[in-house]
Regions:
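Juxtamembrane non-transmembrane segments of integral membrane proteins
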Residues: 214-217
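Extended hydrophobic
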Residues: 129, 181-197, 310-345
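Post-signal peptide N-terminal segment of secreted/secretory-pathway proteins
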Residues: 6-61, 65-68
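Short glycine-rich loop/turn motifs that provide flexible caps or phosphate-binding loops at active sites
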Residues: 17, 292, 296, 338
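Short, surface-exposed, charged loop/turn segments at secondary-structure junctions
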Residues: 209-211
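Conserved small/polar residues in nucleotide/adenosyl-binding loops
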Residues: 1-5
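Non-catalytic, conformational "gating/processing" segments within enzyme and secreted inhibitor domains
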Residues: 41-202, 207, 222-310
Length: 345
């Protein structure tokens, strides 16, 4: 389900320009398109983003952070710059890298995510490829004071009953699939929308996510029904930090993380002559939703290391238990942000 998310797709797209052989083929298969198609798609999508759309602001930024002793291939950097508008920084990869990279992420996410790198990397790390995405939008139909129900109950994944304030509204797009129902709530202008998916009673969010695929999400959203939906959304702020190696490996991208199999020679060469491979794909998100709208940000980094081989009736959807949310570009059917809410605390 992660492969369609814009921040992750940008970071992996830059990485793919340094890949070859089976490593590249696995990445192309997971993306569902060739490298050239991926580059063109992400370039075209980024260029289509308006500086401001109605009361919506959306931005995407990319950067490449290169160790000063790493012999990076010019063709790789050209692809990152030409297709992804990546800013390129050379660094000694000491303590200043942590400050500079995190400052860049903070600037590009309007301070919603203030750190991606916790400490200076070891000598084996040659490169970081980073994407930052930011979103700030107002609802198409604002909430009135009478639409806010304070002191409601949310049942957390742990079973604990927690207090939540609910935003109630009538929506017109209903989503329904195997073991899940949901709705789509548009932001001002209609290009972007908040999507909520609530697993059926008796189905945990964890179990639902195990079988969820990008294709299923696409079919769920594009196969929506028009209906009168009585929707209730809790006010919430969610922050997530995910290491995506396991998820990407499950999608068939295996060689990229294997020091003995990864083919990243088109990216450059380490001073030691050791093989390049990806040691980490870190993804952080922040999303805050209230009666005014939504503010969200995401940052994704790919760490490259060197190493020696190793219906029409009224529907009701009340988000009072763990649910999945997305902020979706409804024109391209691309999720900008995705996450889960399992607790109000």
């Amino acid at each position: 389900m992660y492969k369609r998310q814009v921040s992750i797709l940008n970071a992996l797209g830059m990485t793919a320009n340094g890949a070859g052989g089976t490593t590249l083929k696995q990445m192309e298969t997971a993306a569902g398109m060739s490298l050239n198609q991926l580059n063109e798609f992400l370039y075209t999508y980024r260029m289509s983003l308006p500086a401001a759309y109605k009361n919506c602001a959306v931005s995407l930024a990319n950067s490449a952070w290169v160790r000063d002793t790493f012999r990076v291939e010019d063709s790789f950097l050209r692809a990152c710059v030409n297709y992804y508008s990546a800013e390129v920084y050379r660094s000694a990869f000491d303590g200043s890298l942590v400050t500079d990279l995190n400052r860049w992420v903070g600037k590009e996410t309007n301070g919603l995510i203030d750190s991606l790198l916790e400490q200076a990397p070891g000598e084996a790390t040659m490169l970081y490829l980073v994407n930052a995405a930011c979103f700030d939008a107002r609802w198409e139909t604002p909430y009135e004071a009478s639409d806010i129900r304070e002191g409601g109950t949310f049942t957390a994944a742990s079973g604990a009953r927690q207090t939540a304030d609910y935003l109630t509204s009538s929506e017109s797009i209903y989503l329904s699939g195997n073991n899940v129902t949901g709705f789509l709530k548009p932001y001002d202008g209609g290009k972007y929308a908040f999507v909520a998916l609530l697993p059926d009673e008796g189905v945990t969010l964890e179990d639902y996510l195990k079988n969820l695929t990008g294709e299923h999400l696409y079919q769920l959203i594009t196969g929506h029904q028009y209906a009168d939906v009585q929707a209730s959304i809790p006010r919430f702020t969610a922050q997530t930090e995910l290491e995506l190696e396991k998820a990407l490996t499950a999608m068939g991208i295996t060689d990229l993380f294997d020091v003995s199999r990864a083919d990243l020679r088109a990216m450059g060469s380490a001073p030691s002559g050791n093989n390049l491979y990806v040691s980490s794909v870190l993804h952080k998100t922040y999303l805050s939703l209230d009666e005014n709208g939504t503010r969200a940000a995401a940052a994704t980094s790919v760490q490259v290391n060197s190493g020696s081989a190793q219906p029409t009736d009224v529907k009701t959807v009340t988000l009072d238990r763990p649910f999945l949310y997305m902020v979706v570009d409804t024109h391209a059917c691309v999720p900008l942000f995705m996450g889960t809410v399992t607790s109000m605390e």
